[in-house]
Design a protein with these regions (language model features):
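Bacterial signal peptide processing site
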Residues: 19-21
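Sec-dependent signal peptide recognition
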Residues: 2-8
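Extracellular beta-sheet/turn segments enriched in Thr/Pro/Gly and aliphatic residues
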Residues: 133-150
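Tryptophan-paired
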Residues: 64-102
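A short, amphipathic beta-strand motif
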Residues: 32-42
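A short beta-turn/strand-edge loop motif at beta-sheet boundaries
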Residues: 42-49, 63-64, 95-96
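Acidic, glycine-anchored loop motifs typical of Ca2+
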Residues: 118-123
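C-terminal motif of bacterial Sec signal peptides marking the signal peptidase cleavage site
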Residues: 14-17
Length: 150
């Protein structure tokens, strides 16, 4: 009897681990591609081609809370315009703090961490987002969102 129970328990554990693996794979498969095109005129030469684009999310109805990083991508470019593709996880709303419901509206925006002039610091002499033109809002439902740079 003990052997039968032990065999059933081991079989159950093996089956459960297979089910968990399938859930993990399906969650990965459900990630959404979000494309952002960075456009503008660069007055300076791009000496450092490597940078990082970060996608943030913040609840629409909550004021004065820090945004949550939901995806990031490293990129390389020598010229403008350029495009980056984020892999937005299917469960990205569960990452947002403070916690929100799946039905809550979320505002998405992008930021750059890019020392484009290669002087060792990210500052106003680099290619930066042009907030005077528009806030870098990202619409995850559209084919491509455009962000202005200067």
């Amino acid at each position: 009897m003990k052997k039968t129970i032990a065999v059933l328990m081991v079989s159950s554990l093996a089956f459960m681990s297979c089910m968990n693996q399938q859930k993990t794979n399906s969650a990965d498969a459900e990630s959404t591609k979000v494309t952002v095109e960075f456009v503008g005129n660069s007055n300076g030469e791009i000496k450092n081609k490597a940078g990082k684009a970060i996608l943030f999310a913040v609840p629409d109805q909550v004021a004065d809370v820090p945004a949550t990083e939901v995806a990031s991508v490293n990129f390389e470019t020598r010229s403008l315009p350029f495009t980056v593709n984020f892999d937005l996880p299917a469960n990205h709303k569960s990452l947002i703090k403070p916690e929100i419901k799946d039905t809550d509206r979320v505002h998405y925006y992008v930021s750059l961490d890019w020392d484009s002039d290669g002087n060792g610091t990210v500052d106003s002499t680099d290619v930066v987002i042009d907030y005077d033109q528009a806030f870098p809002t990202v619409d995850i439902g559209s084919a491509t969102s455009r962000v202005m740079l200067k």
